[in-house]
């Protein structure tokens, strides 16, 4: 296999893996959105008819609404700390040759 074929093979493999990864991500996103909207649906419950002979019918109401209104008049004034990191000089001193050596 010549070098050009190796480059094409490696890049094609990388592109294939990235496309598969993108498809898995889109499927995950679609499932999350679909399941999120499915939770909000309430089951259809029919009202019991008057002609039923069973007198122990239980009606469950799933449409409950709670309204809360919070009113606060609190103003917090916080002084910001004057912290400045000077990035024009190194953050730590290098005392070894290992970092500067090239292999």
From Swiss-Prot:
Metal-binding among keywords: yes
Record field: catalytic activity: Hydrolysis of alpha-(2->3)-, alpha-(2->6)-, alpha-(2->8)- glycosidic linkages of terminal sialic acid residues in oligosaccharides, glycoproteins, glycolipids, colominic acid and synthetic substrates
Annotated keywords: Calcium, Glycoprotein, Glycosidase, Host cell membrane, Host membrane, Hydrolase, Membrane, Metal-binding, Signal-anchor, Transmembrane, Transmembrane helix, Virion
All ranges on the Virion surface side of the membrane: 36-103
GO molecular-function terms, A-Z: exo-alpha-sialidase activity; metal ion binding
UniProt-listed Enzyme Commission number(s): 3.2.1.18
Listed GO CC annotations: host cell plasma membrane; membrane; virion membrane
PTM field: N-glycosylated.
Membrane topology, as annotated: Single-pass type II membrane protein
The record's note on its domains: Intact N-terminus is essential for virion morphogenesis. Possesses two apical sorting signals, one in the ectodomain, which is likely to be a glycan, and the other in the transmembrane domain. The transmembrane domain also plays a role in lipid raft association.
Similarity comment: Belongs to the glycosyl hydrolase 34 family.
Quaternary assembly: Homotetramer.
Full protein name: Neuraminidase
Source organism of this protein record: Influenza A virus (strain A/Duck/Alberta/28/1976 H4N6)
């Amino acid at each position: 296999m010549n070098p050009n074929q190796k480059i094409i093979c490696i890049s094609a493999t990388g592109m294939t893996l990235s496309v598969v990864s993108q498809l898995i991500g889109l499927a995950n996103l679609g499932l999350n959105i679909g399941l999120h909207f499915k939770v909000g649906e309430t089951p259809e419950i029919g009202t019991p008819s008057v002609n039923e002979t069973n007198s122990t019918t239980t009606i469950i109401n799933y449409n409950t609404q709670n309204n809360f209104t919070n009113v606060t008049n609190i103003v917090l004034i916080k002084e910001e700390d004057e912290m400045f990191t000077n990035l024009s000089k190194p953050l730590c001193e290098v005392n070894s040759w290992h970092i500067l050596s090239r292999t």
